């Protein structure tokens, strides 16, 4: 959220004068809510086997929450989705945003990315890939 706020401020747009149906958000995520997934699975495994998951499990886990929250905060109503393509996610978000503007589907796009899969599963998985 902070990175998107700073990008919007740095762009110098006067958002109140723009058509918010023509402003979109595309945000990259390498994996998504890995910490949420890991915690829910560990809590389930430690229990009695009864499937008890947090009702916010899915919304906290899916990568589309980030662009959705950015749009909600600023009232943007244009294209909105996340790209999930590992280490290329943010680059893909930038390319997609450029193309949305080029073909006329939006006038302004907020784009970027974020990731922090610093969990047991994330570190072990990347270690197994010899990517650390």
Per-range role (PLM):
Residues 1-10:
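Conserved FAD-binding subdomain of flavin-dependent enzymes
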Residues 9-19, 27-132:
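Acyl-thioester C-C bond-transforming condensing/cleaving domain
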Residues 1, 24-28:
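Short, conserved beta-strand segments within well-ordered enzyme catalytic domains
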